[in-house]
Amino acid sequence: MTFKGFQMNEEKLEIGIQDASSENCQLQESQKQLLQEAEVWKEQVSELNKQKITFEDSKVHAEQVLNDKENHIETLTERLLKIKDQAAVLEEDITDDGNLELEMNSELKDGAYLDNPPKGALKKLIHAAKLNASLTTLEGERNQFIFSYLKLIKPGRA
């Protein structure tokens, strides 16, 4: 080969080296940007995991509160039904023989009043009205918890 051939090869190699060096710099810059983006994504994933744990804890708490409220509503409903039945019996007793006190004492001995509800028809009706109001309030709270629970489970749908 001649000297001129070596010069041409050398020029081609230098151009190739410059191109490779330029591409290497671009790739290093791209790698640096990708590493920065990966760090941002890592932080976002960490934050989302924290939110997920918080939402799961809130969900468990909401389910427990909802369960407690439903149990309370069930208990109040049972008591209210018992009181309604007792009010009907009292009404029959009043209209039948007028011996309310004797009938109430008999029921007390039989264990009909487990929670010591008030004595007397009017007091029982007032007690029943209070229980009914409490039941209505608890049902409203239960519905609100259900709505909140659904919002936690399916954000944007409830």
Swiss-Prot record:
Q: Which InterPro entries match?
A: cTAGE_MIA/OTOR
Organism domain of life: Eukaryota
* Tissue specificity comment: Expressed in normal tissues including colon, mammary gland, ovary, placenta, stomach and testis, as well as several fetal tissues.
Q: Which UniProt keywords apply?
A: Coiled coil
* Any coiled-coil regions, as ranges: 26-96
- Specify whether Coiled coil is a keyword of the entry: yes
Similarity-based family:
Belongs to the cTAGE family.
Any remaining note in the record? Tumor-associated antigen found in several cutaneous T-cell lymphoma (CTCL). Expressed in 4 of 11 Mycosis fungoides tissues and in a T-zone lymphoma.
Q: What does this protein do?
A: Tumor-associated antigen.
Q: Which PANTHER family match?
A: MELANOMA INHIBITORY ACTIVITY-RELATED (PTHR23158), MIA SH3 DOMAIN ER EXPORT FACTOR 2 (PTHR23158:SF55)
Full protein name: Putative cTAGE family member 3
Q: Which organism is it from?
A: Homo sapiens
